[in-house]
């Protein structure tokens, strides 16, 4: 501490001296100042010293030499902070420029345990500089755009729980290095009750010494989950704009200005930087194509193709309308985020909140878009920190979204999860406050959202019954889509997941398989009797020439009979050879389907 204070005193004294020289020079002769915002770019320290070769006077040369000396002193002091943690700062080394980093065979052996623990190669991460640069994958036009100097300031919020220290600090360094100083209000680190000791005192001491006054650390007293942890970060933010990021990202140069400019134009826009991938094994940065963010009816997020009007415009730098968000990064006006109810605090852990925000923003007067001119690279981990029964939490959260925002289309979420509409067996908590919020904001209905924001989403309003289909002669097995390439339905021990999701429609079609997502991707297939084979086929409904061959008569606890052939779907017991699913003349076998829609 004493040595650090001496450095600070020395720095202040020298800066005063330098300021005197600069004022003296300013009065003696004009000094050309570079325009633009290059001051916030990362530069090798030697670059300042090299400018002395172009000095116009011995006095200016002395000033530049003094600045170079000061920079060396400060750099050595700050770099010592990272060295004490076993980490690296600077501009070279492994993984520079987003290239794949490697380990020796001996190091590879040491890396196995940490890799399994974190879901990425944390041992390798410690060998990569906190300041490394990554590729600039922005469209060419983006690099030519100019932005106002009077943009709003941003508070960058990182959420972490038991993350590798090197990965967190690289996220912080990258944010500082690639966000203009006058636009970066603060960085907020929200620790969702981590167990790792290095994420406590060592982390706090480092960020407060390395970036004094810039970084706040918020500690949750119990594990809240990503959703509520982000809300805690928002509560302490003071910037006009808040950016929420996973704590395993790296920023591309120029990422902030286009985001803040779009929000300055319209405070009700939620902006998503385009996402690139950091490979979890070697930290290579891999470009992802420009995409919108959509979701399935289970409310699992996914990348989808940008809308047709974006493609028709022929300009890859334009914003991309998106129905929802993947969730690893989003930026929003702080007040607007509060006005629309933040994220749903009644949700647990994570999953579904990203879909809820997209739906809510669009229905309640805002918009959401992906910006190709702003890019953030993100590690897709093999292992998640909140991995205890995450499927249950996602299901529960999805039902909250359905009950509050989806009107009659809420049935699609229940169908996708194979749950009854009434008494699904999951306590989703009280949603009255979220419904009251929707009413107070005078939000549109979900039909409008599907028609205008997510028209690509497949709809299944014609469903009358769904779930596992069981035969009274073989109750332990269910109708199953079997291997996709065989195009034949089979019987398989009941498990209730997607391959066994049967859906009977008003038209008499019998679909089998998980619900489809967008019209650009395959839909669930139809059960077909082609009149020739004893085996029931699963085919693309639109490609079946005879409508009758894909229509079935079925009532609960009754036969399933094809309208075109009159044959029934039945099971045949072949003794030790097993049970087959076949088509034949009806013998009175009966089928039951798990759920119905009244």
Curated annotation (Swiss-Prot):
One of its GO terms (molecular function) is polypeptide N-acetylgalactosaminyltransferase activity. The keyword Membrane applies. Residues 151-262 are annotated as: Catalytic subdomain A. It is an enzyme of class 2 (transferase). It is a single-pass type II membrane protein. There are two conserved domains in the glycosyltransferase region: the N-terminal domain (domain A, also called GT1 motif), which is probably involved in manganese coordination and substrate binding and the C-terminal domain (domain B, also called Gal/GalNAc-T motif), which is probably involved in catalytic reaction and UDP-Gal binding. The ricin B-type lectin domain binds to GalNAc and contributes to the glycopeptide specificity. Glycans are attached at residues 50, 461, 486. It comes from Homo sapiens (Human). GO terms for cellular component: Golgi apparatus; Golgi membrane. Residues 319-381 are annotated as: Catalytic subdomain B. It is found in: Golgi apparatus membrane. Gene3D superfamilies: 2.80.10.50, Spore Coat Polysaccharide Biosynthesis Protein SpsA, Chain A. It catalyses: L-seryl-[protein] + UDP-N-acetyl-alpha-D-galactosamine = a 3-O-[N-acetyl-alpha-D-galactosaminyl]-L-seryl-[protein] + UDP + H(+); L-threonyl-[protein] + UDP-N-acetyl-alpha-D-galactosamine = a 3-O-[N-acetyl-alpha-D-galactosaminyl]-L-threonyl-[protein] + UDP + H(+). This is Polypeptide N-acetylgalactosaminyltransferase 17. GO terms for biological process: protein O-linked glycosylation. The gene is GALNT17. Its EC number is 2.4.1.41. Residues 465-594 form the Ricin B-type lectin domain. Its cofactor is Mn(2+).
